[in-house]
Amino acid sequence: MLSKVRIALDAMGGDVGPAVVIPGAAISLQRHSATEFLLVGDRARIEPELEKHPALKAASRIVHTDVAVSGSDKPSQALRRGRRTSSMWLAIDAVKKGEADVAVSAGNTGALMAMSRFHLRTLPGIDRPAITGIWPTKRGESVVLDLGATIGGDAHHLVSLAVMGAAMASVLFNKPRPTVGLLNIGAEEIKGHEEIREASEILRARNLPELDYIGFVEGDGIGKGLADVIVAEGFSGNIALKAAEGTARQMAELLRNEMQRSWLSKLGYLFARSAFQALRDKMDPNKSNGGVFLGLNGLVVKSHGGTSAEGFAYAIDVGYEMAHYDLLNKINQMLNREGGALNSVQAAQEAVS
């Protein structure tokens, strides 16, 4: 457990840049005083915002660059143009050099993943990293991955996601053996494509001590909180994420419209205001902001590009928690335990095949 967490922020990332990143960092610092910030970006744009937050200024150091990755840059373009010079790259580089424990960016997702994978590399036994989110549920929260980093994947990839997701859940939820489910079109063992059925067979056959595999989970099972960890390949995981976020916004809009429809509904709202506020807080996408790139040789957190300062603060909070509780070391321990969890999984995959 780290007593002091050093966080590198891509101050130029997102739709707004320093005007959101800096106040967001100030909000997070109020919750986690044992934090030091490396603010990477254009000094001329960072300093005016930083002057508004004396406590943050005292806990921060600026690394100047006027090069930023745009939202329209393709990953290959971002690597070619922004390598070694952009605010995104330099934030990741701080993690690589050990100057920061985690990097947080609201910038271009594809570029951030490409730069992170290129510069930090993946952990032994991990072929491809995953975007991992924290999902509000009826039971509390669940870890969901992959939310769009990799389209497709074989059984070994899905099992590696299960192992990494379980490591993150054990850190977040303080559970030594979190429950894990595979997202599928049905709960029956015969449902789904070959890769997901094979992954299920491997997880059952191996019975890993790091996780409790419960089987397939349908889409509605995510919100029900049927498992601490929900595993999906990136295509279906991203669709599930966008559908849930859209539904949350639609429900909030529908409720707001109905509450304003008549004087009677307005009166009813006054009596139930605390309940509606609790519901709104539960469904607030800002509070689920912060996708962790799992599978890399370093910690990187992706924030929504269009988030507010409060939303960006939640992404920083996620990075703080992951670094403070030493998630990377936890994943490495789980991968290497008993001769390597994934090596054992590979043997199980060959036996199943």
From Swiss-Prot:
GO terms for cellular component: cytoplasm. Pathway: Lipid metabolism; phospholipid metabolism. One of its GO terms (biological process) is phospholipid biosynthetic process. Keywords: Cytoplasm, Lipid biosynthesis, Lipid metabolism, Phospholipid biosynthesis, Phospholipid metabolism, Transferase. InterPro entries: FA_synthesis, Phospholipid_synth_PlsX-like. It catalyses: a fatty acyl-[ACP] + phosphate = an acyl phosphate + holo-[ACP]. Belongs to the PlsX family. This is Phosphate acyltransferase. The gene is plsX.
